[in-house]
Amino acid sequence: MKKSDFHYELPEELIAQAPLAERAASRLLVVPPAPAAFGDRQVRDLPELLQPGDLLIFNDTRVIPARLFGQKASGGRVEILIERLLGEREARVQIGASKSPKAGSVIALDAGGQAEVLGRDGEFYLLRFQIPTPLEHWLLEAGRLPLPPYIRREPGVEDRERYQTVFAREVGAVAAPTAGLHFDEPLLARLRERGVEFGHVTLHVGAGTFQPVRVDKLDQHVMHKEWLNVGATLVEQVRRTRARGGRVIAVGTTVVRSLESAWRKTEAAPEGELQPFAGETQIFILPGYRIRSVDAMVTNFHLPESTLMMMVCAFAGRERIFAAYHHAIAQRYRFFSYGDAMLLWGGESGVGNGES
């Protein structure tokens, strides 16, 4: 399988550069299993599309202002993107500079303080910060929000709120789980009234999510690592949902990645079952992989040739996904992080397109 198998052409003007005024006003392309027709709805219509007893699972990670700027002793400019916090004063980071900094070198930070390069960690660097407060708190004032590179503007005050989900609580991501950006408190209240239950996982989206696939043969691709936590409470919620005939709906690819990473074969469940898990995942989901943990997913539109595009093709089928993307482009949907969303149903869900 090749990277080029997941390419599509997208008019640049369809890349959303800013969020809509209302989160739930985003459009929602409902994609039932073939041959049912697609449905053009809005995210605020989700209560009509789900059933009492269904379980929506969100990623509760919170984005940190992870971008910093500084200067080497030589005078060369440096851009730092924090990939993961490693305690109160250390972090794993990406560094952009004309020449790679050496271990022991010190970067003077524009926001004040210094960062010492401890060494390499694969494609990343390890930094120790000399700052007055723990890094997590210091970044709230000193860091800049790391908007994706396809958003061609500087982050503004509005992004501090809008590039964060309303249920974000576990600090550690450098990019938002963007499917969750569409949910606001009024929509969550209407879903509760409908009888839909909520669960949460944590997956700290890392800087690797911005990196393109650099090889054409996908069996040569090395997937980036991310830390996640699927707790016992969520596992029990899923078990109860299945027992009563409800459906499990992931809000975002990060939730699918979390649940599939926590899927384990046991003697009692030879096909596998969800189990509590906390740790790193490097799972790479592409066509040929069977996603077992969810019946549906809410997800944004993904970049051509990205691992996220490959994941949704694994879930709904490549032909079906490409047909949906062509429909979305023709209907002028907005793409990527601040864009519109899809509701993808798996092949055995038995649902329609939500059109009356």
From Swiss-Prot:
HAMAP family the UniProt entry points to: QueA
Subcellular location(s) of the protein: Cytoplasm
The gene coding this protein: queA
EC number of the protein: 2.4.99.17
Keywords tagged on the record: Cytoplasm, Queuosine biosynthesis, S-adenosyl-L-methionine, Transferase
Molecular function as annotated in GO: S-adenosylmethionine:tRNA ribosyltransferase-isomerase activity
Function, as annotated: Transfers and isomerizes the ribose moiety from AdoMet to the 7-aminomethyl group of 7-deazaguanine (preQ1-tRNA) to give epoxyqueuosine (oQ-tRNA).
Taxonomic placement: Bacteria, Pseudomonadati, Pseudomonadota, Gammaproteobacteria, Lysobacterales
Pfam families according to UniProt: Queuosine_synth
GO terms of biological process kind: queuosine biosynthetic process; tRNA wobble guanine modification
Name of the protein in question: S-adenosylmethionine:tRNA ribosyltransferase-isomerase
Swiss-Prot/TrEMBL catalytic activity: 7-aminomethyl-7-carbaguanosine(34) in tRNA + S-adenosyl-L-methionine = epoxyqueuosine(34) in tRNA + adenine + L-methionine + 2 H(+)
Family that this chain belongs to: Belongs to the QueA family.
